[in-house]
């Protein structure tokens, strides 16, 4: 009985005195499209660009208190059969949002989407090598990654 009590006491002591520099931030922040399903009509054409869904992978660097992440964006270009373009350039932004909806970092990326001679051309875009700061004591669920069209 005393042996079990001693083991539990030692474990509690170790956990309570552990170094706070190695906090567990938990899962990756949630990546979402700005309006749930963002649509934008392109100037001087019938083209409509639509962002549908995202995927995100992340890695925490706890010593430097930052997060490295990559985002994948999936979408469609609608009415691509009505234009003679082979490629369409679109501008996408990625915002890393912290607690209280404070924007910590924002990036813009101009990407080229290859159009097919179809009513709807689907695309997927990798956005890699993003890095942002995190606060100690905050978990991954305290942050969001918002993606949209500029």
Please provide the spans of the model-predicted regions.
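Extended low-complexity, serine/threonine- and proline-enriched intrinsically disordered segments
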Residues: 88-101, 145-149
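One-face residue pattern on beta-strands with alternating periodicity enriched for small/polar residues
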Residues: 68-74, 91, 146
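Short, solvent-exposed beta-strand/turn "edge" segments of beta-rich domains on protein surfaces
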Residues: 45-46, 56-70, 79-86, 100, ...
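Post-signal peptide N-terminal segment of mature Sec-exported envelope proteins
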Residues: 24-45
């Amino acid at each position: 009985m005393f042996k079990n009590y001693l083991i539990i006491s030692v474990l509690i002591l170790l956990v309570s005195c552990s170094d706070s520099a190695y906090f567990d931030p938990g899962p990756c922040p949630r990546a979402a499209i700005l309006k749930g399903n963002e649509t934008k009509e392109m100037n001087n054409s019938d083209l409509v660009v639509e962002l549908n869904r995202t995927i995100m992978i992340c890695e925490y660097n706890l010593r430097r208190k930052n997060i490295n992440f990559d985002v994948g964006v999936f979408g469609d270009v609608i009415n691509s059969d009505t234009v003679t373009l082979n490629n369409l350039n679109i501008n996408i932004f990625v915002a890393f949002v912290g607690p209280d909806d404070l924007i910590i970092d924002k990036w813009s990326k101009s990407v080229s989407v290859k159009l097919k001679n179809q009513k709807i051309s689907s695309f997927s875009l990798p956005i890699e090598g993003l890095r942002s700061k995190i606060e100690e004591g905050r978990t991954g669920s305290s942050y969001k990654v918002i993606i949209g069209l500029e």
